Every structure is written in C-alpha cells, then in structure tokens.
Amino acid sequence: MEHLGKVFREFRTSGNYSLKEAAGESWSTSQLSRFELGESDLAVSRFFEILDNIHVTIENFMDKARNFHNHEHVSMMAQIIPLYYSNDIAGFQKLQREQLEKSKSSTTPLYFELNWILLQGLICQRDATYDMKQDDLDKVADYLFKIEEWTMYELILFGNLYSFYDVDYVTRIGREVMEREEFYQEISRHKRLVLILALNCYQHCLEHSSFYNANYFEAYTEKIIDKGIKLYERNVFHLFKRFCLISKRTV
C-alpha cells in the first residue's frame, strides 16, 4: 500500500538518514524516492533490507503504519459527520469524486473504492431516492471476508453498511467480531466501536424478527457494557430490550 512509503519516509527523516544511506547497496535512491512518494512498490526482501538500513523493526514500522492508515480514515470521517447530519448529498458526492480520483492514481485503489461505497451507503441512508448496487455490497463483503485482523477501519465500514445486508450475513460477521475479545480488551476506542456494532446487529436482528440471533447480541452487549460506557449507549440498549419483549409477544 502506498501509505507505507510515507511511513518509511517519516522514520527515515526522523532518524536523519539520507536516501543513499537508507537505500544501501540493494536499491537506487531514485527507486527508494518513488516508493516514498507512493509511485512504486518493492519486494518484501528488499523492504526488510531498507528497514535494517535505518534501524527500524518490522513491529515498530507496522504499528506506525496502522496508526497512519487509521488517521487517514479518521480525517475522512471528520468530514462525513457534519454532511450526514445536514443531509448534504452534494457534499457526499464531492467526497466520492475525490475518492474516485485517488483510486485512479493509486497502485492500491481498493481502499478508495471502499470509501466510495461507504459514502454511497450514507447517501442512501439520508435520501431514499438513491440505492446501493449489489456489486458494491459484494465488494465490501468480499473484502471483509479476506481480512483476518480487523482494525478500526473495518469496524466503521461494516458498522455503517450492515443495514444493507441480510440478517444471516450480519449475524455471521457480527459473531466473528464479538468472539475476538482480545481485539478490544486493551483498546477502549475499539471496545466502544464493538459495542456499537453489537447494538447495530441486535437492532438488525430484531427488525427482521430473528429473535434467536438477537438473543446472542443481547447477551453479548450485556457482557461488555459497563459503567464506563456512555449513558446514550446504555439507554439505546434498554430500549432495544423492551422492543424485543414487545415483539416476541406479538409474534
């Protein structure tokens, strides 16, 4: 992914290494410069070599790379939130055009294509005259299926698009996330996102009268919700529980 080059450049410059020092004997300075600019990729073996040249471990590098990737997405979400609450469809479409342009010039366009789909989902939520294409939903589902280690990005992506999927798929994906407790135990931000996702899955099951699956998400939410959780989420949870009781009586 091209942002890896940007992260490498941050490590190189902060360590006061020149392009020549970082490139070493296995790479030219022009090749390394293109990698830092996101204009080319490099083989894994060479990547490890240039990390050694600037004395950075792969663990430290990937940790910073994940944070860099999350920062990009958080920046986009900061633009999305005011558009969502003001029903600014034109603003969403402007962001979509920007994502499409980035995908055209990127060596790894999938990230920007997924962002476009996320924005389309938000547009559909605010204006029912727009619709989601099944091909786009399939692309997101295929991406999520292939990702073994979910980050904040995947949580936000699925958390904003779950309503377009059938209840069985939402239940399967939701369960997979819920059963990986180590993912959120030490990271409070992730824990809150997982809680919100559990509430979303719970609501989705209730709306489709899938009470057996709803019971799972109710029990899971009960387990992870605590006094540190904001009052809003707690109130939403109690509202859903009452709705569940009423719905079961009318079936």
Describe each model-derived feature in a short phrase.
Residues S45-N60:
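DNA major-groove recognition helix of helix-turn-helix/homeodomain DNA-binding modules
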